[in-house]
Curated annotation (Swiss-Prot):
Its EC number is 3.1.3.-. This is Putative phosphatase bbp_030. Keywords: Hydrolase, Magnesium, Metal-binding. It comes from Buchnera aphidicola subsp. Baizongia pistaciae (strain Bp). InterPro entries: Cof (IPR000150), HAD-like_sf (IPR036412), HAD-SF_hydro_IIB (IPR006379), HAD_sf (IPR023214). Belongs to the HAD-like hydrolase superfamily. Cof family.
Length: 267
């Protein structure tokens, strides 16, 4: 049996309309009541992930900002890791010159954006969390957990990814959560490493975990788990990089909850 269940949110556990269905909530509650540990593993900020936790109304672990922050069942922060400030400064100096790319940053409590142009970059519904426009001279002094770049032109993001890896690859972990969203965290930060930490804390092996995801920021978690399942709607690069993983249905059809119901409750 898998004693830990970990799931991404957007494109995975959430519906395409960015909400938890009643069926999904029911299955997760049954799992927790059965003694299974449930982990939400998301690129979203804690201030958004905690709203999902409230909807579930059961104690769950939260891996937020792709692992830059981890919270236990009592909502206590148990791990944090920020990007080196010199890297944040140099990245912003480079990317602020390209006005087609929207720059967004997470600090511990806030969400910052380079401008208010969301027409090209609004990727998902925000759960009661509002952004602020940043100023370069002040933002570079703050502790930043995650930077993400969004753009209509995916080729520009692919070029940016190559540039970041070649110049700052030893300092940062780079991945696409969506086709048009490139995310940057500190080098050791990933959902996989975070799940390993939680498993260790519980006295379990990460091989006792089953995980679900759809983006490249889920790759380490899916690969390290005892069983990784990717969504039918997964990023094409994820399918290419982990060809042996089982592909379940789309997030349109409660596929994570249906899969969990099948393996835990035989229905």
């Amino acid at each position: 049996m898998y004693y830990i269940v970990a799931s991404d949110l957007d494109g995975t556990l959430l519906s395409p309309q960015f909400y938890l269905t009643e069926y999904t909530k029911k299955i997760i509650k049954r799992l927790v009541n059965k003694g299974i540990y449930f982990v939400i593993a998301t690129g979203r900020h804690y201030n958004e992930a905690k709203e999902i936790q409230k909807m579930l109304n059961v104690p769950v672990f939260l891996i937020t900002s792709n692992g830059a922050r981890i919270y236990d069942l009592n909502k206590k922060l148990i791990y944090s890791c920020d990007i080196e400030q010199k890297v944040v400064k140099e990245l912003l100096q480079k990317c602020l010159l390209n006005h087609d790319i929207l720059i967004q940053l997470y600090s511990h409590n806030n969400w910052y954006v380079s401008n208010n142009n969301y027409s090209a970059s609004s990727l998902y519904v925000s759960f009661s969390f509002r952004s602020k426009i940043f100023e370069f001279k002040t933002i570079i002094k703050k502790k930043i957990s995650k930077i993400f770049f969004t753009c209509k032109n995916v080729k520009k993001l692919l070029c940016l990814e190559k540039y970041i890896i070649s110049h700052w690859g030893k300092y940062v972990n780079v991945s696409f959560s969506f086709l048009n969203c490139l995310e940057i965290m500190s080098k050791t930060v990933s959902k996989g490493n975070s799940l390993q930490l939680i498993a260790n804390m519980l006295g379990l092996s990460i091989k006792n975990c089953i995980s679900f995801g759809d983006g490249m920021n889920d790759k380490e978690m899916l690969d390290m788990s005892g069983k990784g399942c990717m969504m039918d709607n997964s990023h094409y690069l994820l399918k290419k990089s982990l060809p042996n993983l089982e592909i379940i249905g789309s997030n349109k059809f409660d596929s994570v909850a249906m899969y969990l119901n099948k393996i835990y409750f035989k229905k």
